[in-house]
From Swiss-Prot:
Compartments, record wording: Cell inner membrane
Transmembrane segments: 19-39, 74-94, 103-123
Gene label: nuoA1
Subunit structure and binding partners: NDH-1 is composed of 14 different subunits. Subunits NuoA, H, J, K, L, M, N constitute the membrane sector of the complex.
Family to which this protein belongs: Belongs to the complex I subunit 3 family.
Organism per entry: Geobacter metallireducens (strain ATCC 53774 / DSM 7210 / GS-15)
Main localisation: membrane
GO molecular function: NADH dehydrogenase (ubiquinone) activity; NADH:ubiquinone reductase (non-electrogenic) activity; quinone binding
GO CC terms: NADH dehydrogenase complex; plasma membrane
EC number: 7.1.1.-
Name of the protein in its database record: NADH-quinone oxidoreductase subunit A 1
Source lineage: Bacteria, Pseudomonadati, Thermodesulfobacteriota, Desulfuromonadia, Geobacterales
Topological relation to the membrane, as annotated: Multi-pass membrane protein
InterPro entries, per the entry: NAD(P)H_OxRDtase_bac/plastid (IPR023043), NADH_UbQ/plastoQ_OxRdtase_su3 (IPR000440), NDAH_ubi_oxred_su3_sf (IPR038430)
Function: NDH-1 shuttles electrons from NADH, via FMN and iron-sulfur (Fe-S) centers, to quinones in the respiratory chain. The immediate electron acceptor for the enzyme in this species is believed to be ubiquinone. Couples the redox reaction to proton translocation (for every two electrons transferred, four hydrogen ions are translocated across the cytoplasmic membrane), and thus conserves the redox energy in a proton gradient.
C-alpha cells in the first residue's frame, strides 16, 4: 500500500511568527472599531426634526443661511500657509540629516529654497499677498 502525501495548501501563505502580534493587533483594532460604530448606531438618536438639522451656532438661533462665501484672500493665505509649512517640513527633515547628505544635500535644499523664493517673489509682484483696504483702492 503506497502512502500519498498531500501538500499543505492554504489560502494564506505561511508568515513568520513575528507577524502574529501585528495580525492580532489589526484584528483587535478592527473589531473594536466595529463594536464602537455599532454601539453608536444602536445608542444614537433615531428621531430627526428641524432643529437637529440646523448648524450649531453656540445656542443662538440662526437667522440666515449658513452658506456664506468667504473672501478669496483668506483662501489664498491658507494656501500660502500650506505651501510654506510643507517647505518648513522638508527643511527640517534636511536639517536633521545634513551630515549624512553632505554637499549634494546642501545643493538640493538650496535649489529647493531658491525655487520657493522665486515663487514667493512672483506671488508678491502679482499682488497675491496684498489684501485689505490697500488692495481695494487699486
Amino acid at each position: 500500500m503506497q502512502q500519498t502525501t498531500v501538500a499543505n495548501h492554504s489560502l494564506f501563505p505561511t508568515l513568520p511568527p513575528e507577524f502574529l502580534p501585528l495580525a492580532l493587533y489589526t484584528v483587535a483594532a478592527t473589531v473594536l472599531i466595529g463594536v464602537l460604530l455599532l454601539a453608536a448606531w444602536w445608542l444614537g438618536a433615531k428621531t430627526t426634526n428641524r432643529n437637529k438639522e440646523l448648524p450649531y451656532e453656540s445656542g443662538v438661533i440662526p437667522t440666515g443661511s449658513a452658506r456664506l462665501a468667504y473672501p478669496v484672500p483668506f483662501y489664498l493665505i491658507a494656501i500660502f500657509f500650506i505651501v510654506f509649512d510643507v517647505e518648513a517640513a522638508f527643511i527640517f527633515a534636511w536639517a536633521t540629516a545634513w551630515r549624512e547628505l553632505g554637499l549634494a544635500g546642501l545643493i538640493h535644499i538650496t535649489f529647493f529654497i531658491v525655487i520657493l523664493l522665486l515663487g514667493l517673489v512672483w506671488l508678491w509682484m502679482k499682488g497675491g499677498l496684498d489684501w485689505g483696504p490697500s488692495r481695494e483702492r487699486r
